[in-house]
Amino acid sequence: MRKKLALFLTVVLTVVMMANVAIPARASEGSGDDPYKLIMVEEPKPSSGSRKAAGEEAAAAAAAEQTAEAAGDTSDPYKGGGDNADPYKGTGGDNADPYKGTGGDNADPYKGTGGNAAAAAPAAAVAEVEKYVPEPGADAKYTVTVTPDNWVKIENEGGKTLGLSQTSGVKIIEEEGLAFKDLNQNGSLDVYEDWRKPVEERAQDLADQMKGEEKALMLAHGGWDGPFTTEPLAADDASAVYLRAGGRGGVTRAISNGGGAHAKWTNALQEVAESCLYGIPAMISIDPSNISGLIESVSLASTMDPELAAEIGKETAKQYRAAGVTALLGPQVDISSPIMSRAGGTYGEDPQLTLDIATAYVNAMQSTYDENGEDLGWGPESVYCFTKHYGGAGSTEGGRDDHTYGGRYTVFPGENLEAHLITYFDGVFNLPGKTKSSGIMTEYAINVDKDGKQFGGEWAGAYNEFMYSLLDEVGYDSLKITDWGVFGGLGDKTGGLWGAEELSTAERLALGWQRGVNVLGGFGGYGEVGACADGYKELASQIGEEEANAILSKAAYNYFVVMMNLGMFEQPYNDSAYADSIIFSQDANAFGQETQDKSVVMIKNDGVLTGEAKTEKPKVYVPYVYSTGFSASWMMGVSEGTPSWAPGLDLNVLGQYFDVVTDTVGAATGEAGADGNPKYTKEDITRATAEEIADCDYVLVGMTGAYSASYNSHLQAAFGAPRDLTGIEEFYYPPSLQYAEYTADTARDPSISGNTVDGVKENRSYKGRTAPADPNYGHLEALQYANEIAGDIPVIAAVSMERGMVWTEVEPLCDVIFVSYNAHKTDSIARMILGQAEPNGLLVFQQPASMEAIDAQVDDVPRDMECYKDAAGNTYDFAFGMNWSGVIDDARTQKYSAAPLTKVQSHDFGDKLKTAATE
C-alpha cells in the first residue's frame, strides 16, 4: 500500500509541477490501511548538566527579543526542570506515563485504521511558490522582519503582530496603513481576516463562508502521522497531505525532541495550513507532558497549594506555546475511586481539592500575563484546555480502565454523580480570570445509578444526550472534543463505542455531532479524513442539509473563536531559539526541583531524620528490585512481559549525594524469551552481604506501590494480534492494593453494572476470585531482605504511587517512609535525607486498612474507608503528612479535611443526578 501510494504521489506531483496548477481538495479511494506504529518510549529528562539546548548560541538573543505581543516576565522567562525532571520517568510499573506512546517519530497510539475511510491523497499539492516578503508602502504603519526561522514577522503600529510564511502563497493586504493576511488568497480583506473586528464576528464570517463538508474535515483531530522534522514538510508528508485534505487538528507526541526542534516542526505544519483551506491554522494539542519537570496531576495535588498550581499552569503554558502547542488535552479532573486504574492522572479523590487545583491551573494556563502578573486574558502565552473526562469517569466499577469493555460503566451507588461534576460547573466553566471557561473532553464510559439504570441510556460519553443536556442547561458554549477511538479503529471492545457498536463510521460521526460533540478526538487523520465528509453527508441525509450545516457551523464557530482568541490566525509561528532558551534554562531546572520537593509526602519517621544538614557524604545501601513485567492494559492486552532486575532508585542521581552500596546482577538463567535470549529469574542476583552493608548510614529501598488492576480474562489488545482465548474461562479479576495475592471474598455480588446481551444482564462481580501477586512483588522482597540484613541501620522506603495501598506488608519493616506520586522524586528524597529540603506533601488518597476495607468502599463516595494506622498511632488518612516537626497541621489540612463536597453551587440540578430516569 505504501509503495503504491508513494508512486501515486510522485505521479501527481510531477503532473502538478508541469502544469503549474493546484489540484483541488479530493480524497482518493482506498482502504485506509496505513498500519499502526506504536513503540512505547519515555520522554527524556532535561538536564542542565547533560543536555544542551539546540540553538544555544541564539538563546540569549532570542530571550531578549521576544515576540512583541508576548506579555510576561522576561527577567525570568521560565522555570522548571532538574536532572531528575521527568516525574513520569522511573523503574517501570506505575512510573511510566500510560498515556504517552510514540510510534515512529510521533505516531498517535490511540489512532485507528479508520475502518472503511478513504486514504487521503495529497489533496492540494501545490506547485512551488515564489518566496514572498512584504514591502511596506510609503504610508505603511508596520515593519517587516525575516526571522532566523525564515518566517516573516510583521509588526503593526498599535495593532496585532502577524506571522507569515514566505512560501504559503498568502500575501499581505494593506488598509489604512495596517497589514492584514489575505488568508483565503482572494485579494480582498474579509471580515475574518480583519483583526480589528470582534472575534465573534470574524468567527461567524468564516463559518458562513465554508461548505458543510469543509467544516466536517476541519473538525478532525487525527494528525500528525508524518515523521518529525525540523525542515519544511515534503509534499507527500502524511501531515501535509492531511492538512491539504482539510484536517486541522492533532495531538503531538514529539515534544521530547526538544522545545526548539518542536517549534520548527510546528512552524512547518502551520506553513502548510496557511497555504490552504482559508488559511485556517492548525490546532496542535498535547497530553500533559512535564517537559520541564514541573509536577502535575497527583503530584501537584499532594502540595494542596492552588497558588503553586497557578504558577505551574502559567509557566507550563509559556513553555507549550513557545514549542508550538496551542491546546492541552487536560487536566484530568476525574474524582478517583481508591482503585481507579487511571488514578495517576487525576488530582485525587476529593472534590474540593480537585476543584481548587484544577481551577487555578486552568485559569493560569489559558491567560497571558504582563510583567506585573496582571491577567490580560487570551494572548500569545495562553493554552486552551480540554478539561477531562466529562463527567464521572473516576468511578468505573472495579476501577477498570474505561478504554476497555470491562470499563464500560461508571457506577454511582452512593447517588453522588453531582459531586463528580463540581469541578466543571463550579470551576473550569466559571474561571475567575478573563478567559472564563475551558473546553471539555468527553468520557468513554456509561454512567449508571445504584440500580444499574443508565443516565441517558446505553450510550458512552461521546454520544450521551443526557450528559450533553446538562451543559445546555447552564448555557455552556465552548469546545467539546471526544476522547480517542470513540468512532472506531480500536476494535469493538475498546475505546468508548458503547451504544454505537452496530453503527457505521459515518453514522457514528453523524450521531456524535447531532448529540453535541464539536471536535473528533483522534479521528480523521491520514487515511481517515475522507470519512469526516462521509459523516457530514450521513448527517445531512438524516436531518436535512440546512440543519446539518447549522450544527457544524456552530462547531466550527466555537473552534474559530478559540483559535482567534489564541491569536493563531494572525501569528501561528514560533521562535525556536526562544523556545530552547525558556525550556532548558537554569531557572527552569531550579523551579522544577522546587516543585518536586513540595510534592513529596513523608508518612513515617521514627526519629531517624531531623532535618539537620549532613556535613559528610553518607553511605547508603540501595537494593535491586525484581519485576515480572506482567501487564494487562487496553493497548497491549494481557502480556507476560519480560522479567527484569533494576535498582529501586536511580543510582546515577543517588551517587551525587551518597556513597552507594548495591547488589550485583548476574547473567539471565531463565527460559528463552521471544527474542531467543534467556529471561531473568529471581535467582539471578547477588545481594550485598551484611559485611558490605555494616558501615552504611542508611538502607534506602525504592519501591513501586502495590496495584493489580481489575480486568476481564478475555481482554484483547487494541494493537497487535488477537489472543487465542480457547479454553480460557471468562471472568473478572479483582483489583488489589497489596503485593501478595488477594481473594475477594467480601466483594459486591452481583455487580451493579453489566451489558445486557440477548436479554440477559451480565454479572461482572469478582467475588471469590483471586488477584495474583503484584508484578512488583519483588520490590517487597527487596524490602524484606533489607530489613533482615540492616540490623540497627535505619531502613528508609521510597515508594512511588498513583493511589493508595495496604501498608501492613510494608510499614512495620521501615523506619522512614517517603511517598512520591507518579514517579520517584529521587533528588528530592536524597536532599531530604541530607537535610537540604523538608517534606511538605500530603496524601491525596486514603490508605486502606485492608483489602476488605476497599471492598466495603462505595465507588462514587470520596473518603469513606477505614484507614491504616501505623505503629506510632498515626492514621494514613486523606491530607495526612509529616515534616520535621511531626504531623502537619496547617491551613491546608484544616481546609481539606472538611467533609467532602456533594453539590454544585452555581446551578441547581435538583435530584436528576441521584438516580437515572431511563433504563
Model-inferred region functions:
Residues 10-20:
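Bacterial N-terminal signal peptides
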Residues 1-7:
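Positively charged n-region of N-terminal signal peptides that target proteins for export
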Residues 13, 23-25, 41-43:
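Intrinsic disorder/low-complexity segments, especially N-terminal tails and targeting/processing regions
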Residues 18-33:
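Sec-dependent signal peptide cleavage junction
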Residues 30-37, 42-57, 61-69, 81, ...:
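Glycoside hydrolase catalytic-domain context in secreted enzymes
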Residues 74-114:
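Long, intrinsically disordered low-complexity tandem-repeat segments
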